[in-house]
Regions:
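N-terminal auxiliary segments of SAM/dcSAM-dependent transferases
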Residues: 61-145
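Class I SAM-dependent transferase core
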Residues: 117-120, 124, 130-179
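Conserved class I S-adenosyl-L-methionine
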Residues: 183-190
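Conserved SAM-binding loop of SAM-dependent methyltransferases across substrates and taxa
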Residues: 193-204
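Conserved SAM-binding strand-loop segment of SAM-dependent methyltransferases
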Residues: 228-242
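A short acidic, Gly/Pro-enriched loop at the edge of an enzyme's catalytic core
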Residues: 242-254
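A short glycine-rich, Lys/Arg-flanked "PGG" loop and its adjoining helix->strand segment in the class I
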Residues: 267-282
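Substrate-binding/catalytic lobe of Class I Rossmann-like enzymes that use SAM or dcSAM, i.e.
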Residues: 297-298, 303-403, 411-412
Length: 417
C-alpha cells in the first residue's frame, strides 16, 4: 500500500540491489553482451545477499536487538532516486491532474455503498479502479525518492534498525511464518515493484507470483526480478476482479502487505484465495486496521481518520475482527492475530518517514520558486506530506495500525457438511 509520508536520511542505502525501472526510459542501458548481462545478474544476487540483515552467532530469530544491521552506502540507491526523480519531472499535466483527483476515493469507504454510488454512479467499482491506477502510477515513484520504495512502513521489529532493515526483518518473519521453502509457489497480492518478492525468493528459495493493479509497477517487477535471475511472475490484475486467473490448489502459500484496504469484499477475496491454495497452506496478511480504541463517534478520532485515510491510501476501514470473520467464513482456521511491532507501535518509523519527506519538500519548494524544477513537484510533495503527524498521533493513541498480522491455514481436509 502506498504510504504517503517519508523516510530517514536521504537515498543512502538499499536493502535489495538497484532499481532497473523500465518506465523511466533512461537511454544508454547496455544489454548488448550476454557476458555483461550474466555479470550484472551475479552482481545483483550478491548484492541482495550482502545487504540482508545479519544475525550474530547464536542470536534468536526474533525482533530483538540481536541483528547487526547493514547501513552501508549503496550507489544503487542513488540510481533508484535519480530514475524516480526523472520520471516525476517528466509527468504530463494530465498525469498530475489524474493523480490529484484520485484522492477523492479516500474520502469514501467500501462499507458505504450508497455514498459510493452517489459519488461515482452504479459503476463505482470501475471508477475506483481507474483512480487507483492513476494514484499508484505516480505514488510509487514518489515513494522511491525515500526509504519506502516498497510502499509500506513496516512493523517495528528492531529499534536500532532503519526503516528498510525493519522491512527486511518483517519479510523474513513472513517467510518463516508461512513456511516458505525452495520449490514452493507463493502468491503475493499487491506486489508493487517486485522488491518484496525478490527478497522472499532470495531468503527462502520459493517462487513468487505477484499481482498488482498498476502496469507500470508490474513492468518494473518483471525487469528487476529477471535481472536478479529469479523466475518470479507478475501480472496486472485488480484484486476486486474475481475470480483470479489461477487453477484450484495451485499455490503453497499466500501473503500480502498493506493491500487489503483496496479490497471491496474481503470475504469474496478470501474464498477465492482459499480455492487456489493447497490443503495445509498458510495465509498471512499484514495490513491496515482500526483498533478497538477507535470510536467513530468521537470527533477527534473521526477527524484524525479523515486525515489519515488519504495519506495511507485506504478505501476500506477493516478491523481485526472483520478480517478474522471473513477468513473463517472462507474456510480458514485463524492461528494467529496480533500486532508484531515492539510494544504494538510503529510511530517511530512513521515519524522518520514523515521527517525525511518534509525535509525533501522544503528543498523541492525552494527549487520550484527559483524555477529550477517544474511547479508540479510542489503540488505533488505538498499532497504527499499532508497529515503525516496525524498518522503518528493515531498510532500513538493505538487507534489504528498499518501492520496488523493475521495468520490462517487451509485445513488438510475439508470440513464435513
Amino acid at each position: 500500500m502506498a504510504t504517503a509520508t517519508a523516510m530517514p536520511s536521504a537515498p543512502t542505502h538499499e536493502p535489495i540491489l538497484r532499481d532497473p525501472t523500465t518506465t523511466f526510459a533512461i537511454t544508454g542501458r547496455n544489454d548488448s553482451s550476454d557476458s555483461s548481462r550474466t555479470s550484472d545478474i551475479s552482481s545483483e544476487k550478491a548484492n541482495i545477499r550482502a545487504q540482508q540483515p545479519r544475525r550474530k552467532s547464536g542470536a534468536k530469530k526474533a525482533h530483538t536487538d540481536d541483528y547487526v544491521v547493514d547501513r552501508s552506502v549503496s550507489p544503487n540507491r542513488l540510481k533508484t532516486f535519480l530514475k524516480a526523480f526523472k520520471h516525476i519531472r517528466d509527468l504530463t499535466p494530465q498525469q498530475v491532474d489524474d493523480f490529484m483527483a484520485s484522492y477523492e476515493i479516500y474520502n469514501l469507504d467500501w462499507a458505504d455503498e450508497e455514498a459510493m454510488i452517489a459519488a461515482f454512479g452504479p459503476d463505482y467499482q470501475q471508477r475506483v479502479g481507474r483512480c487507483l491506477a492513476a494514484y499508484y502510477s505516480v505514488i510509487n515513484h514518489l515513494c522511491s525518492l525515500g526509504d519506502v520504495e516498497k510502499m509500506y512502513i513496516p512493523p517495528l521489529m528492531n529499534k536500532k534498525a532503519s526503516v528498510r532493515d525493519n522491512q527486511l526483518l518483517c519479510e523474513e518473519s513472513i517467510a518463516r511464518e508461512i513456511g516458505l521453502k525452495p520449490g514452493m509457489r507463493v502468491l503475493d497480492l499487491g506486489c508493487g515493484r517486485g522488491r518484496v518478492a525478490a527478497h522472499m525468493t532470495s531468503f527462502s528459495g520459493a517462487t513468487v507470483t505477484g499481482i498488482n493493479i498498476d502496469a507500470n509497477q508490474v513492468a518494473q517487477a518483471h525487469e528487476f526480478n529477471q535481472k536478479c535471475g529469479f523466475a518470479n511472475e507478475f501480472i496486472v490484475r485488480d484484486q476486486n476482479d474475481l475470480p483470479l486467473p489461477f487453477a484450484d490448489e495451485s499455490f503453497d502459500a499466500f501473503y500480502e502487505i498493506q493491500a487489503l484496504s483496496l479490497c471491496k469484499d474481503p470475504s469474496a477475496l478470501f474464498k477465492e484465495i482459499y480455492r487456489i491454495l493447497k490443503p495445509g497452506s498458510k495465509f498471512l496478511l499484514i495490513d491496515w486496521v482500526s483498533l478497538p480504541a477507535y470510536d467513530p463517534a468521537d470527533p477527534t478520532h473521526a477527524s484524525l481518520m479523515r486525515r489519515v485515510k488519504p495519506l495511507i491510501g485506504a478505501v476500506g476501514t477493516p478491523t481485526p475482527t472483520s478480517f478474522e470473520g471473513a477468513l473463517r467464513d472462507a474456510g480458514f482456521a485463524v492461528t494467529r492475530s496480533d500486532n508484531p511491532s515492539i510494544d504494538g507501535l510503529q510511530a517511530g518509523l512513521i515519524d522518520k518517514v514523515d521527517i525525511y519527506f518534509r525535509s525533501v519538500r522544503r528543498l523541492i519548494n525552494c527549487l520550484a520558486r527559483l524555477h529550477a524544477l517544474p511547479l508540479h513537484f510542489k503540488t505533488l510533495f505538498d499532497r504527499l506530506c499532508l497529515d503525516g503527524q496525524a498518522f503518528v498521533e493515531m498510532d500513538n493513541m493505538r487507534l489504528i495500525t498499518t501492520t496488523y498480522r493475521i495468520v490462517a491455514e487451509k485445513p488438510l481436509h475439508a470440513p464435513s457438511s
